[in-house]
Amino acid sequence: MCGIFGYLGQRNAVPLVLEGLSKLEYRGYDSAGIAALTKDHLFVEKSVGPVSQLCSKVSSDMHSQVAIGHTRWATHGEPSRFNAHPHVDMYESCALVHNGIIENFQTLREDLSSKGVEFSSDTDTEVIVQLFASRYRETGDLVQSFSWTLKQLQGSFACALVHQDHPEILLCATYESPLILGLGEEEVFISSDVHAFLKYSCQIQTLASGELAVLRIGRPVEIYNFELSRIQKEVRCIDHAEGSLDKQGFDYYMLKEIYEQPEVFERILHFVCEENGFAESFLKEFSFEGIESLHIVACGSSYHAGCLAKYVIESMVSIPVYVETASEFRYRQPYIAKRSLAILISQSGETADTLAALNEFRKLDEVRVLGICNVRGSVLASRVDHCVFIEAGLEVGVASTKAFTAQLLVLILLGLKLASQRQEISKQDLMQAVQGLRELPRLTRLFLDSSIHDWRCRQSKETSFIFLGRRFMYPICMEAALKLKEIAYVEANAYPAGEMKHGPIALIQEGTPVIVYCGDPFVYTKTIGAIMEVKARKAYVIALARESNQDIAAVSDEQIYIPDSHDLAAPILFAIAGQIMAYTMALQKGTEVDRPRNLAKSVTVE
């Protein structure tokens, strides 16, 4: 992983591919490369570092009608020029780029080595191109050799290949990894992410898992399954507004996306809510009838959103809710009762562990699967029974902000819908909840316009922070701690406030920074008790509380006040406070806010 881009057409492919790769950098990278075909030459260039490094190595005179490129985030082999994509076969006749992980690469590599194939990298990707080249030398059939190669692979992959014998052809394929075609007039773009080519084409085709495409200059796209049966695919038009990569005057994408949250909430509420209840179209095609348990599966920030959903749904509905990290779910062999509902959450819709969990649910009878996703046409969206889109728009910052709070809002609304269908919430309580959530855009703007941006952490030189919260605030603390780890590079751990006395309090010494979320009125007094425990051990307490809880100043060293709101809206507002705190601390420490080290935006490998 992390990003594929390619072009075939009448224009010069080289600058187009380099531009496309630069737009994929937000997904994560440690190296980049490009391969281009001319009539008599296969040109390959690679570099470690950002795409700008690659651009400096490619001559502006280089011209080709067919090229592929890749931004890499290391999974097999350290970041290096040798391990960067594209990879070529031992005769340097063809080049390939690949996202994903080939699980049987070692077996394939050993078999090829025994036949005299020489490898030049440590990657699983090189196995694919060497395997293809070996088959092509036997058969001379480009497409058949590509199809045969794909069927030998175990794991997940999206890949693109060019061959110097066929300078007018580009081959690409996918299996449980995203790949999108952008169609123009006598030209085709390919990318892991539609936003990378949206400037040039809004007509798209999404390759489904188990499909390959044959692109020829001046010819229509041909799509097949791996058995080479022809497939007809619909062309979809995507809105250019979905692809903005402009910072719009902000210093960082993360800050821009924090400020976009009121508009995101307005979009969600417009689609989902009417004045005192739900729009008829919300989950119209999906029934909760007969559901006896819920299983929420996700990774990272999406997992934290699922944790809040458990608290919220179980507070309203008399059914159990289980929340699992996707990477553990697949291997834990959990018992899933019939008449369960699985909710899978992924911003990108391509998170490998979450998709693996989806495969497990698909093996079960009488289990319905609902997706929560931000990307139409994604693998997750295409394979669940129904998908609710969070309408967050493109999120470029690696640390999730608007997508996370959009997930929170959608999950809270889903819980209210479930409670309403099961008649476990009164019409009056439902009306008050919906009205309270409809206040979110206004309250978010109010908070973002407050003095919060003047806040500076007096403990920014500390290397370890503790976050405490109870009930609805605990999952929000978990997310805040993750944000601090991701972009400020400090150790941060979140605990239920009541658990301090059961071990973590041993970490407290004079000056230890403890950030306490006091936003849940149901457990406010209990949370104050936790503050007193750590203050007695001379901790430095930063308290986040509602504006009506000014008394918090008497027991804390610093205070951040969040506008009063409905209890279901409060976690979202407190989550935004955590985002701003992490952003501010990252600035104080001088770290890379939008592209933190070692992290990728879309984790397409397990």
Swiss-Prot record:
Pfam families with a match to the protein in the record: GATase_6, SIS
Any idea where the Glutamine amidotransferase type-2 domain is? 2-218
Which residues are the active-site ones? C2 (nucleophile), K601 (for fru-6p isomerization activity)
Keywords carried by this UniProt record = Aminotransferase, Cytoplasm, Glutamine amidotransferase, Repeat, Transferase
Q: Give every SIS domain span.
A: 278-424, 455-596
Q: Tell where it localizes.
A: Cytoplasm
**Source species, domain of life:** Bacteria
Q: Which GO cellular component does the record give, naming just one?
A: cytosol
* SUBUNIT field: Homodimer.
**Could you tell me what this protein does?**
Catalyzes the first step in hexosamine metabolism, converting fructose-6P into glucosamine-6P using glutamine as a nitrogen source.
Q: What is this protein called?
A: Glutamine--fructose-6-phosphate aminotransferase [isomerizing]
Species of origin: Chlamydia muridarum (strain MoPn / Nigg)
Which gene holds the coding sequence for this protein?
glmS
